[in-house]
Amino acid sequence: MLRSLCSIAVRLGGARQPRLLSSAASGDGNDGKGAKDAIDEDLLNAIEGVANNIHPQNGSEKKSLKNTLINRLVANEKASFDAAAASASSEMLDDQALIGLLADVAGDAKVEKKLPPKSAQLRQEKRGLVLLRKEIFYQAVQSGFTTEEARVKSETIVNEAQIKLQEQRKALLNDVREKVEQEEVEETERSEKDQKLFTMALEFMEKIYKDDLISSAVRKPVKVDNDAIKLFNQKPLGIWKKGEKYEDFSLGFWKQWDERAARISNGSFGPTNSFEEQIEWTTKGKQWEYPIDNEFKMGDESNVSFIDHVFLERHLPSLGIPKSGPIAHFMHLVCVGLSKNPYMTAAKKREHLKWFADYFNTEKQKLVHKLHEQEQIAAQNAL
């Protein structure tokens, strides 16, 4: 009987959607999780019923049985949460981009390297920001936020951390410290979950950005030579009389590269509204472009005349088709059928005519003519 009642209690608890230990906190700030944090009211009522049925008179035995069942259910819930957290951690560790970024950060901490070019540094910073937003999004979902709230948190928190880091760098350059009281007020106003995510984003941000502005030994200042020739202050030589004919020329590769980087950075979280979603569908060819055109993406067929689709008999003499007889009558029917076909291109229709012309060669024409004469003679004799 105990086994059957325990199975009923477990089924009642499994029928409801389980709450993870990480998202079931009561909000009172205590680190320890009670029984109600992992077990709902229905399951507690089922356990109470099991204890009353087995030990209706003995209060100590009833309490001991309840504690045993609750401890086992909490242990089962904790095991499922640990398994989910382990799979999520393994998925994060399998991310090669994040591993490469952390490896670069660890290498920079151990070995002093030369400062990379400014363009490469900007690309690395953009790449690190995208990865950081993904990590904050994942951590926010694990903390109990919804998907939409996690997306907003990842954007706002990373932006706040970026602004905060820029202010700290400016303060170090100007030897000015920010007010400690203002920081304490901001930290107290921010909730516990937001503060945890903000601290993580700030730590990652400090590793992503290079401290080239702080270290004066990294880049030496360039002294301007005041005695150098100033090219823009010289008189024109007058070699080119008409300068309006000349235009600035630049490689389109760099413009395409910047547009591609912008698309990757902006599209990391997908479209934010239905308008951007429809724009994405239109660029991928999944939706009609406005204004609606029935000849959308016809290609070379848009330049083909209607005459080339309908009047096909004019091609028969050049293909060697006889002007009279059964073959001519058959090819006339072929041309009529092809002229009424709206799904074939004009070139494809001409290929069909050429195939029939190759089929009705000289030998086939003689054979058809002979069979036609024999049929006419047989018809006359039948009369």
Swiss-Prot record:
KW Zinc (keyword) present: no
Entry GO terms, CC: mitochondrial small ribosomal subunit
A GO MF term: structural constituent of ribosome
UniProt keyword terms in alphabetical order: Coiled coil, Mitochondrion, Ribonucleoprotein, Ribosomal protein, Transit peptide
Chief location bin: mitochondrion
Classification via InterPro entries: MRP-S31
Disulfide cysteine pairs (residue numbers): none
Protein location: Mitochondrion
Transit peptide, from-to: 1-21
Coiled-coil blocks: 158-187
Domain of life: Eukaryota
Known partners and oligomeric status: Component of the mitochondrial ribosome small subunit (28S) which comprises a 12S rRNA and about 30 distinct proteins.
Official protein name in the record: Small ribosomal subunit protein mS31
Source organism (scientific name): Caenorhabditis elegans
